[in-house]
Regions:
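Membrane-interface helix-loop junctions in multi-pass transport and translocation proteins
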Residues: 134-137, 144-176
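Interfacial transmembrane-helix starts/ends
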Residues: 29, 61-77, 85-89, 107-110
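Membrane-interface junctions at transmembrane-helix termini in multi-pass inner-membrane proteins
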Residues: 114-145, 161
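Interfacial segments at transmembrane-helix termini and the short loops linking adjacent helices
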Residues: 22-23, 62-63, 88-118, 165
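Alpha-helical transmembrane segments of multipass membrane proteins
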Residues: 35, 39, 79-87, 120, ...
């Protein structure tokens, strides 16, 4: 399962390099390092969830599982708001970070990256709960289809738009 998730979410740089051009990876990395860090923190916070859900399921604590899931959704909403604040100040942050080498920040690309990141966090929350409940077969089929869909959407989208953000959007759409 970890390999399937890696293929779905960690091949964007490779796809950008193949379908858009290696120079576009630099722009993607700036957005990823700033906005993607929020999804990374959320994913890190999920580390104990899988085993906690398994334990609660064995102990027949369905209400506790539902409550934990609602808290996860609430955390996604909170992180989503943090992303919006980050997108608002991102031009200033990038200029401070990179100085005169700074890229021109696109708020549209930033917002699309936020949507991708929300989908990523939602998917990781559901992944951890599904695995904790022993639904690994269902999740592995779903992730495999999403991985194939991601490649197809990326190929089509980049043939039309030739932008790194197309790869990010394709990944979000495929993961839904």
């Amino acid at each position: 399962l970890q390999i399937i998730i890696m293929v779905l979410f960690n091949v964007k740089e490779l796809y950008i390099s193949w379908f858009v051009g290696a120079e576009a990876v630099v722009d993607y990395q700036i957005y990823y390092k700033l906005i993607g860090m929020i999804g990374g923190l959320f994913s890190l916070a999920l580390n104990p969830v899988w085993s906690a859900v398994t334990k609660a399921l064995v102990e027949k604590k369905e209400q506790w599982i539902r409550g934990l899931y609602r808290k996860g959704i609430g955390l996604i909403a909170l992180f989503g708001l943090a992303q919006l604040v980050l997108v608002a100040v991102m031009p200033m942050v990038v200029k401070l970070w990179l100085g005169e080498n700074a890229i021109e920040v696109s708020r549209v690309a930033g917002l699309l990256f936020c949507v991708y990141n929300l989908v990523y966090m939602w998917m990781m929350l559901n992944y951890n709960f599904a695995c904790g409940m022993g639904r690994t077969k269902v999740i592995s089929i779903w992730l495999t289809v999403a991985g194939a869909g991601n490649l197809l959407l990326t190929m089509w989208g980049c043939s039309v738009y030739r932008s790194w953000i197309t790869v990010v959007v394709a990944t979000a759409v495929a993961a839904i």
